[in-house]
Swiss-Prot record:
Alphabetized UniProt keyword annotations: Repeat, Secreted, Signal, Virulence
SS bond list: none
Function comment: Not known; immunogenic protein.
Secreted among keywords: yes
One Pfam family here: CHAP
Intracellular or extracellular location(s): Secreted
Name of the protein in its database record: Staphylococcal secretory antigen ssaA2
Endpoints of the signal sequence: 1-27
Region (7 X 3 AA repeats of Y-[NS]-N): 83-115
Annotated organism of origin: Staphylococcus aureus (strain MSSA476)
Subcellular location, principal: secreted
Entry superkingdom: Bacteria
Length: 269
């Protein structure tokens, strides 16, 4: 699936996400993601974040969550696992998601804020979890050659417990990955560059072997970078989703990394 969304977040804690269109064009990656009306699997989505940090999604494109039953529930895990406070019955795009009637009802009439306010929010943020790659630096396109990962055992993302509120800066890669794993990691691991060491100290296994559901991490760039591993293909290439990679804070994109490149990243399990 292909996706892209852009966030603007206000000091009050509300956010309005606007669809960002166009093709992704990293010089080092040559990706071509985003909504493509000619691709039957392509879509984009918007979402709002309320004062409690809850996400509310709206879909556009050739795929939407009403197809979950056709996909054997895969996307039910992908997008809804860990988000327990939503209502998908009354989206303003007209879709009906009666299967999610158990979720709480929220309105989508949050006030819109401009991009400058979003930058101001991040600059003066009270959150202390740490940052990810800065959209204004070359760390958006990190290329790792080799990294020796620390290793520790005892805890895991798959069997871990929720650590609490997301303390990472909204719009950053660290914020997205914390939510993507359902909060089953530390909320104060600092900048993305510190995550491998912090995870090992906390008892998680950290190595250079990619696996679906793991966190991909690198120390390169001003703050490092983290992404969520969606899948590992038969040829060893790794599909990841991430925030603030090339499009700025709040933008969720996905890409495929070759097996040779993936071998140079750390993976937290």
């Amino acid at each position: 699936m292909k996706k892209i969304a852009t966030a603007t977040i206000a000091t009050a804690g509300f956010a309005t996400i606007a669809i960002a269109s166009g093709n992704q064009a990293h010089a080092s990656e040559q990706d071509n993601y985003g909504y493509n009306p000619n691709d039957p699997t392509s879509y984009s989505y918007t979402y709002t974040i309320d004062a409690q940090g809850n996400y509310h999604y709206t879909w556009k494109g050739n795929w939407h969550p009403s197809q979950l039953n056709q996909d054997n529930g895969y996307y039910s895990y992908y997008y809804y696992n860990g988000y327990n406070n939503y209502n998908y019955n009354n989206y303003n795009n007209g879709y009906s998601y009666n299967n999610y009637s158990r979720y709480n009802n929220y309105s989508n009439n949050n006030q819109s804020y401009n991009y400058n306010n979003y930058n101001s929010y991040n600059t003066n943020s009270y959150r202390t979890g740490g940052l990810g790659a800065s959209y204004s630096t070359s760390s958006n396109n990190v290329q790792v050659t080799t990294t020796m990962a620390p290793s520790s055992n005892g805890r895991s993302i798959s069997s871990g417990y929720t650590s609490g509120r997301n303390l990472y800066t909204s719009g950053q890669c660290t914020y997205y990955v914390f939510d993507r794993v359902g909060g089953k990691i530390g909320s104060t691991w600092g900048n993305a560059s510190n995550w491998a060491n912090a995870a090992a100290r906390a008892g998680y296994t950290v190595n250079n072997t990619p696996k679906a559901g793991a966190i991909m991490q690198t120390t390169q760039g001003a703050y490092g970078h983290v992404a969520y591993v969606e899948s590992v293909n038969s040829n060893g290439s790794v599909r990841v989703s991430e925030m603030n990679y090339g499009y700025g804070p709040g933008v969720v994109t996905s890409r495929t990394i070759s097996a040779s490149q993936a071998a140079g990243y750390n993976f937290i399990h």
